[in-house]
């Protein structure tokens, strides 16, 4: 889907064409996470808490892949708008080299030092034991993930979002089936609890990787080929590093900072951790539309900027922001609407249920803050290659404001859990003035392609 000159109404047609598959993909991801929590809910509160804490490493690693994929997507979307497929393959190889190296390192740490990893989040020995068994198996997942996430990012950058969605759908559906099998001991299998979740995830990601190679074999343009690992371009490597390193730093800094929320809550007790593990799942459902619009918008705007039409990109960015505000409001209402159902099925103790109720209500407004910032920082700004702003903005906001405030409130003032959580959830609104000012200046709109690479 190479994007050519568009009429005024084509913006919404192209946005929906890109957004719908991404929404489905994100909903599937949220549904699988929900299924994990629902099934672990019947295993016990400790299993939910341990997997929730151990999953912070997966979340950080995902943000590493997302940061690398951002640099690849920015370049590939603009070069696709220009019709340069050779440059896309070179960028794919560069990205794979980085992602595979990082995956290998993290997988080794997860296999040999899982207890040390869990100690970062909790002193509770039961949670450490459960989480360590989960992490050791997840090392296999990390190896597969490092390859598939790059290939899926390249597919999305050239508009093949439906194929990307189908591959994720395969992994997600298989994950749910295998989770049920290993958690509850279906089809004669033993009941493995949290360890079963890790096995199911590893197997589903392995199947997804095989499916990626099949799609690559059938594809006429974007392929997943080992030879791309050995294609070198000094110019494109420099461009990739210039775009990816700030994006990678931004995403990892934000993700690690967000994981620090779990550190704070983890030291406030297992009730807070268990409640938060359910809240994260519900919040992910509420933000599905916002993140889909940001992802689709970055692809669409990147294609337009690659053609050199910067004024049109600014016009489309304005419409995209309006869509995001509406999506944020809808997301908050979704969280509010499903809160009674979550409270009905949860089997937590009374204290954790109390935390759960009010944490969910806090997230009805938090989603709006996250929606606007995500659309602008991860969508609009990055489409034009402006990745440094997000790094500076999020790092200052999270590490100089939210994290110190959370630790101070929890361990110095010793405020109640819900007050600590409320203060942590003010981070998105603190950076609004800065983000909106940068958007209005319009310096983010740039054509980052080169005539010769």
Residue ranges and their predicted role:
Residues 27, 31-49, 116-125, 181-192, ...:
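Helix-terminus/linker motif at the lipid-water interface of multi-pass membrane proteins
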Residues 69, 138-157, 164-172, 197-212, ...:
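Short runs within selected transmembrane alpha-helices of multi-pass transporters and secretion channels
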Residues 48-108, 145-164, 262, 275-339, ...:
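Small-residue-rich hydrophobic transmembrane alpha-helices
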Residues 17-36, 137, 148, 171, ...:
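Transmembrane helical elements of multi-pass membrane transporters/channels
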Residues 23, 27, 31, 35, ...:
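Generic alpha-helical transmembrane segments of integral inner-membrane proteins
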Residues 1-19, 76-141, 189-244, 301-367, ...:
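Short alpha-helical transmembrane segments in multi-pass integral membrane proteins
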């Amino acid at each position: 889907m190479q994007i050519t000159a568009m009429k005024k109404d084509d913006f919404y047609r192209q946005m929906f064409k890109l957004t719908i598959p991404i929404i489905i993909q994100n909903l599937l991801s949220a549904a699988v996470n929900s299924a994990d929590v629902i099934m672990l809910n019947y295993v016990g509160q400790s299993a939910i808490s341990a997997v929730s804490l151990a999953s912070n490493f997966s979340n950080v690693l995902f943000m590493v892949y997302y940061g690398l994929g951002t640099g690849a997507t920015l370049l590939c979307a603009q070069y696709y708008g220009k019709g340069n497929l050779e440059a896309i393959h070179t960028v794919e190889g560069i990205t794979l080299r980085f992602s595979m190296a990082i995956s290998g390192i993290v997988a080794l740490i997860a296999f040999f030092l899982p207890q040390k990893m869990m100690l970062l989040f909790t002193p509770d020995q039961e949670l450490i034991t459960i989480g360590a068994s989960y992490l050791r198996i997840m090392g296999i997942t990390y190896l597969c993930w490092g390859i598939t996430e790059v290939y899926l990012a390249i597919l999305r950058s050239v508009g093949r979002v439906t194929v990307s969605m189908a591959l994720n759908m395969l992994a997600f559906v298989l994950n749910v089936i295998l989770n049920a099998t290993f958690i509850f001991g279906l089809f004669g299998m033993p009941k493995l609890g949290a360890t079963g979740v890790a096995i199911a995830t590893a197997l589903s990601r392995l199947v997804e990787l095989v499916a990626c190679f099949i799609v690559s074999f059938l594809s006429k343009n974007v392929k997943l080929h080992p030879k791309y690992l050995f294609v070198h371009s000094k110019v494109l490597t420099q461009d990739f590093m210039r775009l990816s390193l700030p994006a990678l730093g931004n995403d990892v800094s934000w993700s690690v900072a967000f994981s620090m929320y779990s550190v704070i809550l983890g030291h406030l007790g297992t009730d807070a951790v268990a409640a938060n593990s359910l809240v994260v799942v519900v919040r992910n459902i509420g933000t599905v539309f916002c993140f889909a619009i940001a992802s689709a918008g970055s692809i669409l705007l990147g294609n337009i900027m690659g053609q050199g039409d910067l004024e049109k990109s600014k016009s489309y960015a304005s419409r995209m922001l309006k869509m995001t505000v509406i999506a944020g409001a809808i997301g908050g209402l979704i969280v509010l609407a499903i809160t009674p159902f979550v409270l009905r099925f949860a089997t937590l103790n009374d204290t954790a249920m109390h935390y759960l109720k009010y944490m969910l209500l806090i997230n009805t407004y938090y989603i709006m803050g996250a929606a606007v910032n995500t659309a602008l920082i991860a969508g609009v700004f990055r489409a034009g290659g402006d990745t440094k702003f997000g790094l500076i903005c999020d790092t200052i906001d999270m590490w100089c404001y939210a994290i110190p405030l959370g630790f101070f409130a929890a361990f110095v003032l010793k405020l109640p859990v819900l007050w600590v959580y409320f203060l942590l959830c003010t981070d998105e609104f603190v950076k609004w003035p800065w983000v909106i000012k940068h958007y209005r200046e319009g310096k983010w709109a740039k054509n980052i392609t080169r005539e010769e690479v």
